[in-house]
Amino acid sequence: MTKKQSFLEIETLIKVAKVLDELKIPYYVSGGYAVSIYGRPRFTADLDMVIKMVPVQTDEFSGHMETLFPKGYVDREQINNAFKEIGEFNVIDPESGLKIDFFIAQKGDFEEECFKKAKRKDVGYKVKFTSPENLIISKLLWYKDSGSTRHLEDIESVLSNSNIDKKYLDSWIKKLGLEEGWDRVKALE
């Protein structure tokens, strides 16, 4: 990734965060971009954002995305279907090539905690990122589903570069049954 490409991706992140703030849609950044904030920088092909959007907001949101990325990929039908079927949709910025994966927040205690603990980090604009603890837990959930060791490497990176609330982390690992993945992470250290 070139410096210009990286700059364009950050610009895209900022534009999307500003729209979400303007529309008062709660959100946080997770995935590889969050790993780069709390751990070692790493390449990621997409931007993962969890949003608390309700179906009545889809038209306004879609309109803003179409204005922001007039030559990009914005599929209103996919956005509407995210509430009925798949729980996610994406938008592509043609200038940076960045694919933004939007995940509709699921109901549950852990998801509520993720929104409560999300922190604004200044990347040229104060964008909300998941907390390092919740990033680790999310990565353990993804590892449990996919088996990809990339998630374990990301966790190791976040652990080595962030101040972590171990009590909070241990509590949620137990509640969500993520001990097996957590044991694998500890074996990497």
Model-predicted regions and their roles:
Residues 1-189:
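Compositionally biased terminal segments of proteins
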